[in-house]
Every structure is written in C-alpha cells, then in structure tokens.
C-alpha cells in the first residue's frame, strides 16, 4: 500500500489506469495520490502475483489508442511520450514503440541505438516494459499478451518483455525503436530484488 502512495502520474492530459496486485488484504485505495482520484483514473485490483498478470489485465481493461506501462517508481517525460504518440499517430502500421529510459542521476539507463530501427527477435532482448508503448487495438486483434510464466513475481522472473515482442513479430506485428526518452527509472528499483535471495 505504501507503493501506491508513491505513484507519480504524468502531468499531461492522459487517461490513467491503475491495476494494484494485492494478494493479501492490504488497504490501498486511501493511499492513492490525488492525481489518481480524478475522473480519468480507473483502478482495478488483482488478488494475485506476477507482473505479467497485471500487464495482461491492463491490456484487457484499456480502451485507449495507446498504452504505456509503469510501476510505482517510474516518472514519465511528458514531451517524450507526446513525441512517441505523434510517431504512432503518423505510422498506423506500428504496433509497438520501444523507447528510452533515463536514470534520475546518471543519464540513459543502458546503451541504446542512436537512431530509429525496426525491432527484430535479435535486437529486442533487453527491452523493459516501461520503455514500451503499444497500440492497444493491434495488440488485442493479434491476441498478444505477456506470458504469465515469466516476469517478476514468478520463478522465471526475466524474459516477459522479450517474449511479448517476439510473439508480436511472429504474429506479423511491427515494432520500432525510437531514440526518445519517455521515462526515468532509478537504478535501484522496486523490481531489483526479484530473483535474488
């Protein structure tokens, strides 16, 4: 419930959908930041664990053109989101944009290509969910979902993003990397401990 209080929604005019995983009986609705209590914010609760389950629930509930994923320690760069959305608006054949994320203190979070490139099964293995923007209708039409056997919260805690992108490519969907920063994410994050003892 403390993590819900730390959520920082984007400042722009975005529709917000919050899915909270709560396999216990924790109270969290009273912890929502004021920005998430508005009429454009929709909340849902899953009584299960596993990030792939929550991401699939978000896809299922989403009624917007595009969807960007986040967790409690992500801060979005509104100008970057707008630029990526403008690209998607101009390129209706693209189902997924993979963009960049920065650290709050150390520049880009990892090495990225310096220019736009089409996603393949060979160049997508290091994707992070908070770098992805999906075209909801295409993802739903192609039946692409996160493999719930992978991702934080289950035994195979890595690989869910890569499988999602590979499944999209296999289904004939197009993904593109854009050198645009859309989010900041700390080096030590809420997901850093998954898979460690």
PLM features per residue range, with description:
Residues 4-44:
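Acidic donor-binding segment of Leloir-type glycosyltransferases
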Residues 45-62:
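Glycine-rich, basic loop-to-helix element that forms the pyrophosphate-binding segment
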Residues 63-64, 128-145:
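Conserved nucleotide-sugar donor-binding
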Residues 67:
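Short aromatic/hydrophobic "clamp" motif used to bind/position activated sugar donors
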Residues 71-75:
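The conserved acidic donor/metal-binding loop of glycosyltransferases
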Residues 79-112:
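Conserved donor NDP-sugar-binding/catalytic core segment of glycosyltransferases
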Residues 151-164:
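Acidic donor-binding loop at a coil-to-helix junction in glycosyltransferase catalytic cores
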Residues 152-153, 173-195:
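Active-site donor/metal-binding and catalytic loop motifs
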């Amino acid at each position: 419930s403390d993590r819900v209080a730390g959520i920082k929604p984007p400042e722009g005019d975005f529709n917000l959908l919050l899915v909270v995983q709560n396999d216990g009986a924790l109270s969290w609705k009273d912890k929502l930041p004021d920005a998430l209590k508005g009429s454009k914010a929709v909340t849902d609760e899953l009584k299960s664990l596993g990030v792939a389950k929550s991401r699939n629930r978000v896809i299922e509930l989403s009624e917007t053109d595009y969807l960007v994923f986040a967790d409690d320690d992500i801060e979005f760069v509104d100008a970057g989101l707008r630029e990526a959305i403008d690209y998607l608006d101009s390129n209706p054949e693209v189902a997924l944009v993979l963009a960049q994320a920065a650290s709050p203190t150390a520049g880009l979070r990892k090495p990225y290509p310096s220019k736009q490139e089409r996603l393949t099964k060979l160049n997508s293995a290091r994707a992070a969910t908070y770098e992805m923007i999906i075209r909801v209708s295409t993802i739903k039409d192609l039946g692409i979902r996160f493999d719930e056997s992978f991702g934080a919260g289950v035994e195979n805690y890595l690989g869910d993003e890569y499988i999602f992108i590979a499944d999209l490519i296999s289904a004939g969907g197009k993904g593109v990397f854009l050198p645009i920063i859309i989010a900041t994410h700390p080096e030590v994050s809420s997901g850093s401990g998954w898979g460690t003892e």
